[in-house]
């Protein structure tokens, strides 16, 4: 890897891009608060998300410390309840979801050749309302009764005013609604940008895989976040006005579970699909090959999006109120398109010239971790096994293998991959690999043993256990490795700060040398409206064709460009140079 990629066409490497137009005046803080630039907002989303991630991780360390040994009890039961409630909320709604929009904001307009997103002010509104919602939820810790303590799933009757009377619970519900509004705003923006602002020649089946994944994610977000907002307002109505919507006497507890999980399981794919897209961008670059099975990968993404709306009730097997065969079958079925994605990723790496830069290491770490989480998910799709393992630490381990394995590993891969594009500087490879191995070892040491804890019968959300239960040794192993996992953020944060200021300067469009999509056809960082000129888009690899024009004919001979692109080539109007 070099920050100055080799060129074969006599091209002179450009210097850092000069600012275009007049610089805006005012303090940096004011400019940040009033910006509508999608690139700045994307970076702000990513910084905000990782800030909440660090807070959520601190809560997790307190939870693990409490469980180190029986009878420790340095936290009260009430404090423990508040911590696991806020930990789950922060990680899902304040880290996992906003960082999706962070990468989408920065990368997606570049990948489709757009000068900005469709609605810049709506974009800024989505960011700030999400941030305010997150602060409101966390401010519950400062109220007399403390933060929300009914679990991040907000099950009734735990969430009613009798069992959770504090104002912190009300602030949590309002914060959830605010983050939902922010996600809807971002989803509208991304959909409109993709449908209306693609560059000439950028057909739907020439879009990068990451853009396709954001497209499907945005559709899912528009379907589920309004439901979450309406359902959460119903809880607030019950608490403040005595609505009895979720009163257990009226079947309200089961109603809430249906409403919540109809949001909750597609939300898992809102968190997963964009990061599948990030991995699909990274693997071809460091395998030195085009994506194997591009069309199949796109249709696998569409299939996952469709099937994700039909599996919510597998979270409710133990209620006895759902049709077990249907939801079990649909859960097994959704693993098929996910398996197709793995087949395509492995096929892309197969016989490629793989180089192990930091983004590629994180991508392979994602694949191994998520694969294990997916296999345990197949186990839980079987109702008899689910009856035994439900609400145990086996479920906690599965959930973290799928979501931590997806969101954290792939978001770190994305940061290392696109950091040169965002800042014009390279990150430190040695620190990046230290960060990876601390995270990989710490994560697997923390959560692997929790499968056995769950199978032995340890329930989730318990603040203590008996020495005679036999859980002590495995809990101590899990806690020790959790602190190793916590330490992994230190080299990451230092790497970001150091590289932002002192990293190796990038003077070419594509510092990795083999980028495929359009973001690698503009400077690092890009100018205000992204491009000073656009290359001709003749396939799903326009940047690669720009940098390696002598490879175009060979790629067509080897069928690395689909038939739809060849047909489009024959029907395109000739350029002025071709006419002359």
Curated annotation (Swiss-Prot):
The record's EC number reads 7.1.1.9
Places the protein is found: Cell membrane
Cofactor(s) listed: Cu(2+); heme
Task: Give the signal peptide, or none.
Answer: none
Q: Which GO terms describe its cellular component?
A: plasma membrane
The catalytic activity, as recorded, is: 4 Fe(II)-[cytochrome c] + O2 + 8 H(+)(in) = 4 Fe(III)-[cytochrome c] + 2 H2O + 4 H(+)(out)
Membrane topology (UniProt) = Multi-pass membrane protein
Say yes or no: keyword Cell membrane present.
yes
What GO biological process terms does the UniProt entry carry, in alphabetical order?
Answer: electron transport coupled proton transport; oxidative phosphorylation; respiratory electron transport chain
Entry annotated with the keyword Heme? yes
Q: Which PANTHER family match?
A: CYTOCHROME C OXIDASE SUBUNIT 1
Q: Tell me any Pfam family this protein matches.
A: COX1
Q: Which residues are involved in binding heme a3?
A: 398
Give the matching CDD domains.
Ubiquinol_Oxidase_I (cd01662)
| Assigned protein family | Belongs to the heme-copper respiratory oxidase family.
Please tell me where Cu cation binds in this chain: 265, 269, 314-315
From which source organism is this entry?
A: Corynebacterium efficiens (strain DSM 44549 / YS-314 / AJ 12310 / JCM 11189 / NBRC 100395)
Q: What is this protein called?
A: Cytochrome c oxidase subunit 1
Q: Which InterPro entries match?
A: Cyt_c_oxase-like_su1_dom, Cyt_c_oxase-like_su1_sf, Cyt_C_Oxase_1, Cyt_c_Oxase_su1_BS, Cyt_c_oxidase_su1_bac
Q: Where is this cross-link: 1'-histidyl-3'-tyrosine (His-Tyr)?
A: 265-269
Entry binding sites for Fe(II)-heme a: 87, 400
Quaternary structure (record)? Associates with subunits II, III and IV to form cytochrome c oxidase.
Summarizing the function annotation, the protein's role is:
Cytochrome c oxidase is the component of the respiratory chain that catalyzes the reduction of oxygen to water. Subunits 1-3 form the functional core of the enzyme complex. CO I is the catalytic subunit of the enzyme. Electrons originating in cytochrome c are transferred via the copper A center of subunit 2 and heme A of subunit 1 to the bimetallic center formed by heme A3 and copper B.
